[in-house]
Amino acid sequence: AGLLVGHDAISAFRGARGGVPRRVIESIEYRPLGDDLALLVSVSRFVAGGRGLQTQLWQCIDGRWLIVAAHVTPRTPAFDRSIWRTVGDPLYQGAWEGPLAGLTVAVKDLFAIKGYRIGAGNPAYLDSARAETTTAPAVADLLRAGASLRGIARTDEFAYSIAGDNPHYGTPPNGARVGALPGGSSSGPATAVALGQADIGLATDTAGSVRVPASYQGLWGLRTTHGLVPRQGLLPLAQSFDTVGWITRDGDTLRRVAEWCLSYDGSQSTESVYGASAVDLPWSFFVPVEVRDAAEPSTRAAFDALGARLAASGASVAHVSIGALDDYQEAFRIVQGAEAWRNDGEWVRAHPDAVGPAVAARFRAAAEITPEQERGARAALVPLRARLTDLVRDRVLVLP
């Protein structure tokens, strides 16, 4: 739904929605706007119930009448199953008072919530799961702060993707651009936040699953330092890299969430990680040259403009080489795959037809990783991690 301009955008929308539901045109309004321009507005009654509204601007180009702009208002669903697995008003009520009182949360379908099963983006896995007896600390912390759970939001299967599509439940819409992928694997929480259906997305990030959907949908996303936020009650993909993070529409909400969750109970404080309070840390940023140079020209230009604004504000922005990106990627891929197979391989092997093609291919590749390869990759990660830690120190690592 939304405004579509141009043949490409209209074709992309038609392709993404997976066909047109059976419907009957109840009425059409036609208004000529000139010899080669016409406006059509129609009301449809769907066979399965509900009505929709469609507005089309037609133009005669080279003797052919084409739709050059359109607006589609589909029938209103109870809730969008591509975004939500379970939704309530609220699903869980938070504390009546607290710094996050009045805000709602979309929880990625990997976190334990008492009384609910973890579905991991796969219906067969959901069917075989048992209801959780406790709630994950990352969820409970938000409830204690006054936020309420709006619902359980979709994820790419087992969080083993960053595209945002799901072959079982459909692809959540992109709240910033019609027809575009939402980004994953935290696709459901990101789209829920982008569409205003939740204020906070509680998500995970192993290889970009907070940052990618936030980027695709114009949101604020934070991948926290590995181990900073408790991961108990989280279905893992790869423990060496899994992190808990949040997605919001604005920086102030993200700051409020982080201030609470990074100072509560089991979360390590800024002082314990950096040896200094947040207010004492320098306004300093670190840009890896190889990552910056790998970006597309338009992205690189926007990123450089941000760096210039930061520098103009008095910040220190350092551009430093981190070495060949392939070294990082290969070591990461092997360790991630080995851990993913240990976590989910037994279930995947027992349900060979239950996983979508893209994720199934990743699991097949993961199953082929040998212990020797994993040991070698873990050994390779040690100096790479040490190098990044030494370069970052008390600076903020910034990537385009």
Could you tell me what each predicted segment is?
Residues 1-8, 205:
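Short, solvent-exposed secondary-structure junction/capping segments
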Residues 5-51, 55:
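Surface-exposed, charged secondary-structure patches
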Residues 51-77:
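Short beta-strand edge/turn micro-motifs at domain boundaries
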Residues 71-131, 135, 158-160, 272:
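Short, well-ordered alpha-helical
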Residues 76-100, 263-400:
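Amidase signature
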Residues 105-108, 142, 344:
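Conserved hydrophobic/aromatic pocket- or pore-lining residues that grip, position, or stack substrates
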Residues 107, 149-154, 202-204, 318-320, ...:
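General beta-strand structural signal in soluble alpha/beta enzymes
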Residues 143-258:
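Short glycine/serine-rich loop segments
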